[in-house]
Amino acid sequence: MSQNKIYDVAIIGAGPGALTAAIYTSRGNLDTVFIDNAAPGGKLIYASKIENWPGDTIVKGTDLAIRFFEHAQAFGAKYEYGKVVDLINIKDDLKELVLEDGKKIQAKSVIIASGMVSRKPREILNYDEFENRGVSYCVICDGPMYGHNPAIIIGGGNSAVEEGTFLSSIASKVYVIVRDSDFIAEKALVNDLKSRKNIEVLFNASVKELHGKDALEYAIVNHNGKEVKLEVASLFPYIGFLPSAEYAKNAGVLEPNGFIKTDEFMETKVPGIYAIGDIRIKDIRQILTATSDGTIAGKILTNRIKK
């Protein structure tokens, strides 16, 4: 990519919202590029199954991600692999993205769609030492590499329950550690998890320590005030997410909590910069709401940018 080229639209991210926006802008004949440093699809690639996408009773997250990605490219949107580290608001109709490798991408408008990243339970003793040596964040991606060894899932929400259920088809035993006295996940998901014979749920529990020589071998868990030793080879935390748009701090669009406020057209307080998906301040974060955001931003930009 030439650094002298100016795109009509640059989209930061490659999740459902980003790819939907790319479909609309490229289909509207806007020169579009989307940038991400992970596999296209965003959190879709971590979902073993999706049951609330209209038209598909059940669909694998990876399959849906591929369909989104191919659809966006079919109309000419270009994919750039890279990590955005700075967003510069040069003027209302010119923005510059700086990538980690020093490359710069300029565009008339920018859509921020970088979503959120997993929250890490760093209060667990030795947690950092076992990242990538037992601690992982994607059951679908990494679960198989730990074989049939017992595993821990931390969390009581939808993601924890879904991934725990999926992991039970790989690991010989799955311990689901829930801080509270009950799940907050949807009932249908909880019922599916409870039907698995090799899943044990520990309520009112928290992981305190991780131990092992070269890789994770066991965890110390506080359960109802008593310490329990669980011999496991892997641990997957699903305890919430944090906003992922630090690169936009110099552009003046971030709120104190790290999220971004927009109007009904997905535009931020800075002209020409839009935000969609999970990074927006909103109450409901779902695949459908992200695609809705992407649709709105894509249509608005198609109408506003004159070719």
From Swiss-Prot:
Its main location: cytoplasm. It catalyses: [thioredoxin]-dithiol + NADP(+) = [thioredoxin]-disulfide + NADPH + H(+). Keywords: Cytoplasm, Disulfide bond, FAD, Flavoprotein, NADP, Oxidoreductase, Redox-active center. Transmembrane segments: none annotated. Its cofactor is FAD. PROSITE patterns: PYRIDINE_REDOX_2 (PS00573). FAD binds at residues 36-43, 278-287. Its EC number is 1.8.1.9. It is found in: Cytoplasm. GO terms for cellular component: cytoplasm. Binds 1 FAD per subunit. Disulfide bonds join 138-141. One of its GO terms (molecular function) is thioredoxin-disulfide reductase (NADPH) activity. It comes from the Bacteria. Pfam families: Pyr_redox_2 (PF07992). InterPro entries: FAD/NAD-bd_sf (IPR036188), FAD/NAD-binding_dom (IPR023753), Ferredoxin-NADP_redctase_2 (IPR050097), Pyr_nucl-diS_OxRdtase_2_AS (IPR008255). Homodimer. Belongs to the class-II pyridine nucleotide-disulfide oxidoreductase family. The active site is a redox-active disulfide bond. This is Thioredoxin reductase.
